[in-house]
Amino acid sequence: MSTLKLNPYFGEYGGMYVPQILVPALKQLETAFVEAQEDDDFKAEFTDLLKNYAGRPTALTLTRNLSPNPMVKIYLKREDLLHGGAHKTNQVLGQALLAKRMGKKEIIAETGAGQHGVATALACALLGLKCKVYMGAKDVARQSPNVFRMRLMGAEVIPVTSGSATLKDACNEAMRDWSGSYEKAHYLLGTAAGPHPFPTIVREFQRIIGEETKKQMLEREGRLPDAVIACVGGGSNAIGMFADFIDEPSVELIGVEPAGKGIDTPMHGAPLKHGKTGIFFGMKAPLMQDSEGQIEESYSISAGLDFPSVGPQHAHLNATGRARYESATDDEALEAFQQLARCEGIIPALESAHAIAYAVKMARECTKETILVVNLSGRGDKDIFTVSDILNGKEV
């Protein structure tokens, strides 16, 4: 048995703020993860699934028409091409293998845009695990294609009507369920947030994104990019891209939060720049709170970014200045969604469109030869009806 212990904190952020009943389950998970990371057979099986089931490595595509500046190259890391349609599949396969290693028979998950739910459903179908997915009722309505996909693959999808009926409420219900079933079930958390050891586990299973990007950039350009850019909700696709570049000081790390209707309105989801530190979802992290410390509702056109907090490592990277966090509005994301489709023939997820929007803005302002890499974290099939309704002037 390994004696290695993971650090539960990133600076002042992170920790394990959960009911005492869940502490043994989290410690069991930490031990299993550490041992798995030292087990060549586990790593070989995970790598094989990523390659021969999920389709890694994913392409690094140089856009031909997106950049508004001839001095700026914009590359896309194509996680939209991964089986399941988004980056979520990477770490879900890892956690599902961990669950089997621990002898668990059931998986509990939460989902916002439905991409994590789809990834969890496909992993459970593949590995013979029972699957239960909690999803905010609003998200069930706006992500009906993904709901059908989950059910088609055998998952039980449970709409959550409490609170704002979005991702944070689905997270709360999933955690509540796990509190009573952890002996037989594994909670397969979908982002790099929540109680320790989830932020570290998710980062390590998503790290492949940045590792591949670094290798591909050196092959294509003979150097590292000037910046890597990713959207940030909970933060898993961004930390997957950032992880292998954190120790490369020449590479700027840029996260893009959802500004919603505008940062100066109550309708946004940007806790890193506009939140206050608090305890939520088992961790200490920036949180959208009112003057009395109550959790404020987050808002984003993209269900996957509609979250009032953020992963603790992003909070630490922001606090230390290693990463820079910007924001993009609904309108900017919608414009980028259409622009990428028209310019490159690629339909991005609305989440990813936030990062595209900022990359185009940044490219416009560059005054020297620059290489940007955007993590195209998912494809936009799930969003076409939402966008169509908005463009046709319907209420969404």
From Swiss-Prot:
Pathway(s) it belongs to: Amino-acid biosynthesis; L-tryptophan biosynthesis; L-tryptophan from chorismate: step 5/5
Keyword presence, Lyase: yes
PROSITE patterns on file: TRP_SYNTHASE_BETA
Signal peptide: none
Its EC number(s): 4.2.1.20
Cofactor(s) listed: pyridoxal 5'-phosphate
GO cellular component, as recorded: cytoplasm
GO molecular function, one term: tryptophan synthase activity
Keywords: Amino-acid biosynthesis, Aromatic amino acid biosynthesis, Lyase, Pyridoxal phosphate, Tryptophan biosynthesis
Residues where N6-(pyridoxal phosphate)lysine is found: 88
Taxonomy, superkingdom: Bacteria
Key word Amino-acid biosynthesis present: yes
HAMAP family with a match to the protein in the record: Trp_synth_beta (MF_00133)
The protein's assembly and partners: Tetramer of two alpha and two beta chains.
Biological function: The beta subunit is responsible for the synthesis of L-tryptophan from indole and L-serine.
NCBIfam families listed in its UniProt record: trpB
Family membership noted in the UniProt record: Belongs to the TrpB family.
Protein name: Tryptophan synthase beta chain
Organism encoding this protein: Shewanella sp. (strain W3-18-1)
